[in-house]
């Protein structure tokens, strides 16, 4: 787990200049390239919809950044209250990205909030491999002597194991000698998610958790092969999205990209927005220092901002037993806007209606919740699903535009 000191909310100068970087895959004689990798749907043979504990999801997100999990949230995790139906509900579909590792294709979560590539492996007991595609070191793989990794989260989930160097291919671009963290121990929380075979981190390599020597992320390994050292994310609401590596796809967004400088001193895609607004209300000039994180579902903000939002939601209340703010499912939620320079990044209200507390419940849990005094905000999938976001390692900087 990465320990994060509290960060002061310091405004960063933002601009809305148009990108001068490549806007489509190139076929140069120097073998540089760009590629798009699409997420896939993977259905599992379960009876009824897939469920997940909202308090567990929430507490894991806090712990990921070294935050303190409040007592009421720990209690909600322990009690099992607040089990939500994950979205999208129909057919129990989860969105993952195929990655070929050592000749085996695994379906991984791409996570801009971490820097490890860890996978289910043949080192796990057979019972824990069931339902998963697992990593088997190729004939060209080599084990890194003395290297190990160990992750744990606030909901009690954990994984650990050995480290190999092997061939990793995403969308036709190959990383030779890429560090692959092979799980030999894993908690039930991960085992039970039969859709997911591991994680590919896209934060900065400085926070890779391999010991004694941190390893390089897949992106840092391959970025010199790309037309431009960037990737762009298009997550979708209740639909598969895509990742563009090495180029910006102008067909996927409207208007011009608004750029924000990134502070990578703690290894994250951290930036500062200028303010926010709720519904059709006036913009509030209140700097929001946050992290763009595809590996976190929720948007987690300072209490005063969260409270200001739910004051505009009829019937909303902060329910300790559920782990956070809830409201009647039929409530029409206002949009939430993050102000980035002269650009307004709008989260539609329907994206903020995260899910029912449990199957058949008329009470729903919100996709915007408190950061519990973390000292910075987390802008997860609830925010990202309405945006085309460019993660540009030159600068570094983030570019935002509304999805087309």
From Swiss-Prot:
Q: Which reaction does it catalyse?
A: Hydrolysis of proteins with broad specificity. Generally favors hydrophobic residues in P1 and P1', but also accepts Lys in P1, which leads to activation of trypsinogen. Does not clot milk
**Where does it reside?**
Secreted
- Please give the Gene Ontology molecular function terms for this protein: aspartic-type endopeptidase activity
Report the enzyme's class at the first EC level: hydrolase
Q: What is recorded on activity versus pH?
A: Optimum pH is 3.0-4.2.
Per UniProt, what is one Pfam family of this protein?
A: Asp
Similarity section:
Belongs to the peptidase A1 family.
- PANTHER family in the cross-refs: ASPERGILLOPEPSIN-1-RELATED, BETA-SITE APP-CLEAVING ENZYME, ISOFORM A-RELATED
- Its protein name is Aspergillopepsin-1
From which source organism is this entry? Aspergillus oryzae (strain ATCC 42149 / RIB 40)
Q: Which gene holds the coding sequence for this protein?
A: pepA
């Amino acid at each position: 787990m990465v320990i994060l000191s509290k960060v002061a909310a310091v405004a960063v100068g933002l601009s809305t200049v148009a990108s001068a970087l490549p806007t489509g895959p190139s076929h140069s004689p120097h073998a540089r390239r760009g590629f798009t990798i699409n997420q896939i749907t993977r259905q599992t043979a379960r009876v009824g919809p897939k469920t997940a504990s909202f308090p567990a999801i929430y507490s894991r997100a806090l712990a990921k950044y070294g935050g303190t999990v409040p007592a009421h949230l720990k209690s909600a995790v322990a009690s099992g209250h607040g089990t939500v139906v994950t979205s999208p509900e129909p057919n129990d579909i989860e969105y993952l990205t195929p990655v070929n590792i050592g000749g085996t294709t695994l379906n991984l979560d791409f996570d801009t909030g971490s820097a490890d590539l860890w996978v289910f492996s043949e080192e796990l007991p057979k019972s824990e491999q069931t339902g998963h595609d697992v990593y088997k070191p190729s004939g060209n793989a080599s084990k890194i002597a003395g290297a190990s990794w160990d992750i744990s989260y606030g909901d009690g989930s954990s994984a650990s194991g050995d480290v190999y160097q092997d061939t990793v291919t995403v969308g036709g671009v190959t990383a030779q000698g890429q560090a692959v963290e092979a799980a030999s121990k894993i908690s039930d929380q991960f085992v039970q998610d039969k859709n997911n075979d591991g994680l590919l981190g896209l934060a900065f390599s400085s926070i890779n958790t391999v010991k004694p020597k941190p390893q390089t992320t897949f992106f840092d390994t391959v970025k010199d092969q790309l037309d431009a050292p960037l990737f762009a994310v298009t997550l979708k609401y209740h639909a598969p999205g895509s990742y563009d590596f090495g180029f910006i796809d102008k067909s996927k967004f409207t208007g011009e990209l608004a750029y924000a400088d990134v502070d990578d001193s703690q290894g994250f895609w951290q930036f500062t927005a200028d303010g926010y607004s709720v519904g059709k209300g006036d913009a509030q000039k209140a700097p929001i220092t946050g992290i763009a994180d595809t590996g976190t579902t929720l948007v987690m903000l300072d209490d005063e901002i969260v409270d200001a939002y739910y004051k505009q939601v009829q019937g909303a209340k902060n329910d300790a037993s559920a782990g956070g703010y809830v409201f009647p499912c039929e409530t029409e939620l206002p949009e939430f806007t993050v102000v980035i320079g002269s650009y307004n990044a709008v989260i539609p209200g329907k994206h903020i209606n995260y899910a029912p507390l449990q199957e058949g419940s008329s009470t729903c849990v919100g996709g915007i919740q408190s950061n519990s005094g973390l000292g910075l905000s987390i802008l997860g999938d609830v925010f990202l699903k309405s945006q085309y976001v460019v993660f540009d390692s030159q600068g570094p900087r983030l570019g935002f535009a509304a999805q087309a």
